[in-house]
Structures are given as structure tokens and as C-alpha cells.
């Protein structure tokens, strides 16, 4: 597995924060690093496989990656990221207690993926731009300023994620996308879903396509297929059982969609013919 080292990314040995844009981010194999990072998805779509679990990411997704996590990007489509790198929560010169603002693992569950709306994403970009402007400065005031900006970024992300509400359609769409991650195997009636999230059906279709690049049903199918591929690689369940568990009522239809999406059959994936290393 590829290991990325801080010496290749941080501008100096005493720098606590670094900005690493990926515009765009191509498919990238599984790796980990000796530093932490906050991945901010600017726009585009892709699959982020985080510690073996697949997540669909789009503009407004924020991922918190620790130094012992492993992850990869695949199935990317104009995926543009900004990575905010930091050595460790306790490696700041002027800040303490940052770990309390970061996602906390509870009972083995780590909430690594958050979502923010478009207006928050704009504020995030402004903070990141200010950090970038000061990257070449190593004096104490500049170091303190960068660390304060990093603290502001964490506060903004935490507050925005905790207070995601139904005030506007963009926030409601974010909640809908999070709901789909948890209910991908359910029978989805888009009229009922639109009503549940106080969106008109037309608005749901338009905004979801703007956000993900595909229609709602195509997005749902892709989500189901990603979950199915994960189960094919990491479980002993039959192809038919996996199809049903991921929301497909017809295993033949599932196999057709699967091959169309990945250019491999479910059996190929089960046998490791796609070259994936378990």
C-alpha cells in the first residue's frame, strides 16, 4: 500500500498546516499517510472508499482522514478536492484541545463524512485561500495566523454540520443525500421522498442532478451497486442475496446494471479478476 509522507507536502519541518489542491482528483489507489487531512469536495462526483467502506462524494462533502486510516478514490467524474493537511491534533504551536472539535469515534463507529451546503462551502474556500496566502511565511505571527484560520475552519465545519436544517432547499438536499446513504436498500418512491424533505419533485430532480451529475434514480442505482461491490469483496453471501440486500428485486437485472457500471460481472468481482487486493 502506498504511504504518503509529510515531508513531501508540508512547506517546512515546523509547518503545522498545508494546503494541497487536487483539481481534478483522478482515481487513486488505496493509501495512507503519516499526517491527518480534511478533504473538502469542491464539485464533481466520485467514490471514496474509506477503511474498506464505499461512500459517494459530491460537492459539499467533507471527509476527515486520520493518520491510520486507509482510503482510495475511484469512479471519479470531474472530482475537485482541496485537502487541508495537518500533522496531528496535538502538533499545533498555538492551539490545544483541537481533538474536541473533530469527529469522535464511538463504539467503533467513526463519522468520517460530513456535508455542508453551498454557502458554507464558499466560506470554507475563503478560509482556505487565506491559509494558502500565508504558506510561505514561517515567522511566529504568520504561524499563529494560519493556526487561527485552521481553528475557524474547524468551528465552521462543526457548527454547519451540527446545525444542518430545513431552512433552504440546498440544506434539505444534503439531508436527503445523507438519508439515501442509510436507506439505499429501501424501495424509494421519489414523490414520497420529495415530500419528506419538503422539496418539489422537479426541484429534487434538478438539484440532485446539479449536485451529482446524474438523475436521482441513476444516483440511487450507483449507490446500491457500490454497496453491492463492497459486499462481493468482503462477504460470503451469494450474488442473489447481495442483490436483494442492496435493493434489487431481480438478480439478473442487478447483474446487467453491475456489468454496465463496472465493466466486470459480479462473479468477476467475487473472484478478484478486477485486480482488487483484499
Curated annotation (Swiss-Prot):
Record domain HTH araC/xylS-type: where: 174-272
InterPro entries (alphabetical): AraC-bd (IPR003313), AraC_XylS_family_regulators (IPR050204), Homeodomain-like_sf (IPR009057), HTH-like (IPR037923), HTH_AraC (IPR018060), HTH_AraC-typ_CS (IPR018062), RhaR_RhaS-like_N (IPR047220), RmlC-like_jellyroll (IPR014710)
Subcellular location: Cytoplasm
Location of the DNA-binding region in this protein: 191-212, 239-262
GO cellular component: cytoplasm
Keyword terms, alphabetized: Activator, Cytoplasm, DNA-binding, Repeat, Rhamnose metabolism, Transcription, Transcription regulation
GO MF, one example: sequence-specific DNA binding
Sites marked Interaction with sigma-70: 241, 250
Domain of life per record: Bacteria
UniProt keyword Nucleotide-binding present: no
Pfam family, one: AraC_binding
GO biological process: positive regulation of DNA-templated transcription; rhamnose metabolic process
SUPFAM superfamilies in the cross-refs: Homeodomain-like (SSF46689), Regulatory protein AraC (SSF51215)
Function summary: Activates expression of the rhaBAD and rhaT operons.
Subunit relationships: Binds DNA as a dimer.
Protein's recorded name: HTH-type transcriptional activator RhaS
Species per Swiss-Prot/TrEMBL record: Escherichia coli O139:H28 (strain E24377A / ETEC)
